[in-house]
Amino acid sequence: MVSHKPSKQRLLLYNLPKHQRHKLLTAKLSKELQQQYGIKRLAIRKGDTVKVMRGDKDVLNFEGKVVEVNRKTGRIAIEGLTRKKADGTPVYRWIHASKVIITKLDLSDAKRKEIIERKRKAREEYLKKKEQTTEAK
């Protein structure tokens, strides 16, 4: 049974294994990519181009390539989105994965293409089943 206590919910999130934490690092695809691939969400990977949809004015609508993905904190670093430390060295501004949309996918990995195809088929089956149940009513 799952607890309703927020403290226990947070504890579960903090102690998730990396392979389960990976599922939390998903972002919506842009409308064009949704139509092209037939899926709505996908896990963010290094090399994807993303657009920031929430945040401060200087971050909002910023578009860039993902440089690093931190599974422990659930945040991503985007190329060109930096701030300067007191000594002048630039550091990345980490953005939470849920605050971005993916505008361009990095499809250099064949496994990722398989994942997209598998998700597309599952979505088509779901929509077909949903359509049949609404017709039956």
UniProtKB/Swiss-Prot annotation:
<comment type="subunit">
    <text>Part of the 50S ribosomal subunit.</text>
</comment>
<dbReference type="InterPro" id="IPR014722">
    <property type="entry name" value="Rib_uL2_dom2"/>
</dbReference>
<dbReference type="InterPro" id="IPR008991">
    <property type="entry name" value="Translation_prot_SH3-like_sf"/>
</dbReference>
<keyword id="KW-0699">rRNA-binding</keyword>
<comment type="function">
    <text>One of two assembly initiator proteins, it binds directly to the 5'-end of the 23S rRNA, where it nucleates assembly of the 50S subunit.</text>
</comment>
<comment type="function">
    <text>Located at the polypeptide exit tunnel on the outside of the subunit.</text>
</comment>
<dbReference type="InterPro" id="IPR041988">
    <property type="entry name" value="Ribosomal_uL24_KOW"/>
</dbReference>
<comment type="similarity">
    <text>Belongs to the universal ribosomal protein uL24 family.</text>
</comment>
<dbReference type="GO" id="GO:0015934">
    <property type="term" value="C:large ribosomal subunit"/>
</dbReference>
<dbReference type="Pfam" id="PF16906">
    <property type="entry name" value="Ribosomal_L26"/>
</dbReference>
<dbReference type="GO" id="GO:0019843">
    <property type="term" value="F:rRNA binding"/>
</dbReference>
<protein>
    <recommendedName>
        <fullName>Large ribosomal subunit protein uL24</fullName>
    </recommendedName>
</protein>
<keyword id="KW-0689">Ribosomal protein</keyword>
<keyword id="KW-0694">RNA-binding</keyword>
<dbReference type="GO" id="GO:0003735">
    <property type="term" value="F:structural constituent of ribosome"/>
</dbReference>
<keyword id="KW-0687">Ribonucleoprotein</keyword>
<dbReference type="InterPro" id="IPR005756">
    <property type="entry name" value="Ribosomal_uL24_euk/arc"/>
</dbReference>
<dbReference type="GO" id="GO:0006412">
    <property type="term" value="P:translation"/>
</dbReference>
